[in-house]
C-alpha cells in the first residue's frame, strides 16, 4: 500500500517506501550510495502503474516504469486472467561507462477465443553487464523470449501449437534461436476403450 497518498474513488495512489542501499564499484575507494523513490498509480481495478527513479552516486539516474493490466477472464478451469505486463528501466548516461543502459521485460497471456490462447514473453538488456552494474545482482544468466499460439478443442480432441523461442545470455556465451516449431495432435476414438492418437510435428 502507498506510504503517502490519497484515495480516488476507492483506489489508492501514492509514494511507496523509498529504498536506500550502499554498494561498491571496482574502482571505488569508498562505498557508493543509491536511493530509489517509487510512486504507485492504482488506475482502475484491472490495471495499475508504478513509476520510480533510482539515483546511484557512481552512475547516475535510472528511470523505471511497470504497467500491469488484466484483459479478460480466462475460459480455463484454473480461473486465471489474461494479463499484459510491461517493465522498462533506462539510464541515459552511465557516468562510468558513458553508455546508455536499459532493460525491457514484457509479457502477455491472452485468450483469443475459448479454444485459442496466445502467450508471449520478450526480455532484453542493453549489455551483458547490466545486472551486475545497474541492478546489482548476478542471479540472471539467460533472458528467454518466446511466442506460443495454442489451440485446444476438447469436443473434437484436437490440439495444436506454434512456438518460437530466442535466448539472450548475460555472459559472453552466444545465445540461441529456436526454429519455428509446429505441432498438431488429434485423437480418434474407434470405441470408448481404444482411443487412437495421431501426431504431426
What is the meaning of each model-derived region?
Residues 1-201:
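Outer-membrane beta-barrel proteins and related beta-barrel translocases across Gram-negative bacteria
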